[in-house]
A protein has these predicted regions:
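Flexible, low-hydrophobicity surface segments
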Residues: 1-153
Length: 153
């Protein structure tokens, strides 16, 4: 008839109960590196300088990339980024790492480490100096003449 009221034998029950089932964490190669991102702590501005000295001392840190290390190659993030029709292409307004911070949480550095703990500790140890710029939090205010502009026209 149906499943309701009847015991159902799960095909994966034995493997799960005996520990043979492979989960995501079981599939990570032993030599895999971990990446964590340092996010901006301001809503709008420019990264003036980045102090990596303490972060680079952390055992297990392999490399730290900053917004000054990667090229400014813009890419779109949504919609039709690869459309051949210019009318359907989204604005290429994102960068891998950002010198011009446009929102709280924008990506400014990437830490590559041998383990997740080292990566997270290094992110916390990075010190970023910003030149803060004005911003608005209201859509109506953002449309007014003279409102702060996040993107170049």
């Amino acid at each position: 008839m149906g499943i309701v009221g009847n015991s159902e034998v799960r095909v994966d029950a034995f493997d799960k109960a005996t520990g043979r089932t492979k989960y995501y964490e079981d599939l990570v190669p032993a030599d895999a590196l971990y990446v964590r991102i340092k996010h901006s702590t301001i809503a709008h501005g420019f990264v003036k300088s980045i102090d990596l000295s303490e972060a680079e001392k952390i055992k297990g840190v392999v490399k730290i990339l900053t917004c000054f290390d990667v090229p400014d190659i813009p890419f779109p993030t949504a919609g039709h980024p690869w459309s051949m029709d210019p009318g359907h292409q989204d604005i290429a307004d994102r960068y891998l790492l950002n010198r011009h911070v446009r929102y709280y949480g924008d990506d400014v550095c990437a830490v590559i480490a041998e383990n997740e703990v080292a990566a997270m500790q290094a992110v916390r140890a990075i010190k970023v100096e910003y030149e803060e710029l004005p911003f608005v939090l209201d859509a109506q205010e953002a449309m007014k003449d003279g409102a702060p502009q996040l993107h170049e026209r």
